[in-house]
Structure formats: structure tokens, C-alpha cells
Amino acid sequence: MSTFPFNPDESWRSAHLGHWLRLALERFDARVLECMAQHPGVPLGLSNLAARGQVSAAHIHITRHLPVTGARLTDLAQAAGMSKQAMGTLVNQCEAWGMVRREGLGGDCRAKRVAFTEIGLAWLGAYQDAVAQAETEMRGAVGDAVATVLALGLEAYSGG
């Protein structure tokens, strides 16, 4: 009979902070996308994509990390914690949807900057509203005091 170098009770696998953080983020992001699909400022085409689940949390990385002034693809990928290739795929999809465009950067004709289009800026505004709505709902679910402590703790833990 083998002996375990740890407690064989496996309940710890689904009862730790990382597990709860992942589930909370999934719920929060899903609610944000739901709010965006219904937002009156989101262009109809993007609203339909969001409502049909075609816009994923991965696409939100562009919304979350692309500065309003634009950024090089490598900088955007780094900010989102993704590879340049994975971010390039997302940018291609968002470009096809009219959310972003690639434009020349200074004197280097090879360098490109990813920037929001007018549609993308409308999407960004809806994202801001949706995040605020999801946060308000979260505060309602757990209470203001818990939400505040949670926000402060996560900010401290993440090094922010």
C-alpha cells in the first residue's frame, strides 16, 4: 500500500483562493459581455456577436489593454500577458469586426500601431459601463464592505 506525502483528501483542489478567483473572474467577464451585448452604444453587429458568444474573454484583452492612443502589437501582447502571435490573431478578428485598425508608426514603414476605430471607441465606452455595472452587481451580492476589502486585498496581492 502506497503512502501519500500529503493529505489524500482532494477537497482542497476546489476550495482554495485561486479556484475562487478563477470562478469569480469567469462570472464577472461573462456578465460584462452580457451587459455589452445589450448596451445601446454598441454597434448592432458587435452586439449580435457578443450576444451569440462570438466575442470571448480573450477579445476583452484588447479592450482592457489597448491604450486609447494605440500601441504596437508587441506592447499590446505584453500588457495582456499573451504571445505576439495569439494577440495578432485577436487583432485580426477585431480588425475584421471594425473595432481596431493597423496604421503606420512614424518613419518605419514596417512598424504598425494598433488603434481603436470609432466603432472600437464605442465598444470601449460600453466596456467601461459594463464593468461598472458588473462591479455594482458584485457589490450588491457580497456587500460593500466585503467588496472593498476584496478590491484592496487583490490590489495589494497583485502588486498594484
Label the model's feature ranges:
Residues L17, F28, V32, A80, ...:
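Non-catalytic interaction surface on structured domains
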Residues N92-A151:
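Charged, amphipathic alpha-helical coiled-coil/dimerization segments
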Residues L21-A24, F28-M36, A80, G120-V142, ...:
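Alpha-helical linker/hinge and terminal dimerization helices associated
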Residues A58, L90-Q93:
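Carboxylate-rich helix-loop segments that flank metal/cofactor sites and access channels
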Residues V32-S83, G159:
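N-terminal helix-turn-helix DNA-binding core of bacterial DNA-binding proteins
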